[in-house]
Regions:
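A basic, amphipathic helix-loop patch mediating RNA/tRNA/ribosome contacts
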Residues: 4-34
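Ferredoxin-type iron-sulfur electron-transfer modules in oxidoreductases and energy-metabolism complexes
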Residues: 4-13, 60-187
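Short, surface-exposed helix-loop/turn micro-motifs enriched in polar/charged residues
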Residues: 17-21, 39, 141
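A generic, well-ordered mixed alpha/beta core segment in the N-terminal half of proteins
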Residues: 26-82
Length: 188
């Protein structure tokens, strides 16, 4: 923060970075810090990373996500619109518009299905899985979103097509293939 103030006073622009919630729930702050997605520590995002994780005098290397599908916009800001396009490719639910609608809240969902869908919905789309994968694969993100959308009764008729469309869009966006290394799961 002090460095940004000094740059502004000199008439220079501070380094651009993305942020939104500052609570670790939006994923906008995603950075590669000292060779790790979100920096040292597990289960946190960059905005939750405290300077006490580093020693006095440490040189800290901060980089944007490194993936073809996340082009750098400026400095540390990347375009993660590819995730939005993947979700849009499969994130739809057919609706009966004949007038004989069943209230969506009236459809019972079992507790195990609800819990599993909720677990899949915890993906905030930060991209740490892609950034940590040597192949820049988005398969963990896609599988989380496919699971989230397919476990609920709404949208079951198109579940298979949704999954195929999302994987196809992932390929179109330039993400790499999964080779089951598991780095994505470690960073998520």
């Amino acid at each position: 923060v002090c460095s940004s103030d000094l740059l502004v006073r000199k008439g220079d622009e501070p380094i651009a970075f993305d942020h939104d919630c500052r609570e670790g729930i939006c994923g906008m702050c995603s950075l590669f810090i000292d060779g790790e997605a979100h920096g040292p520590g597990r289960g946190i995002t960059t905005c939750q990373l405290h300077m006490r994780k580093f020693k006095d005098g440490d040189t800290i290397h901060v980089e944007p996500w490194r993936a073809q599908a996340f082009p750098v916009i400026k400095d540390l800001v990347v375009d993660r619109g590819s995730f939005d396009r993947i979700q849009a490719a499969g994130g739809f639910v057919s609706v009966n518009t004949s007038g004989n609608l069943v209230d969506g809240n009236a459809l019972p969902i079992s507790k195990p299905d609800s819990d599993t869908a909720f677990d899949a919905a915890t993906c905030i789309g930060c991209g740490a899985c892609v950034a940590s994968c040597p192949n820049s694969s988005a398969m963990l993100f896609v599988s989380a979103k496919v699971s989230q959308l397919s476990l609920l009764p709404q949208g079951r008729p198109e579940a298979k097509m949704r999954a195929l469309n999302m994987v196809e869009q992932m390929d179109k966006e330039g993400f790499g293939s999964c080779s089951a290394i598991g780095a994505c799961e470690v960073e998520c």
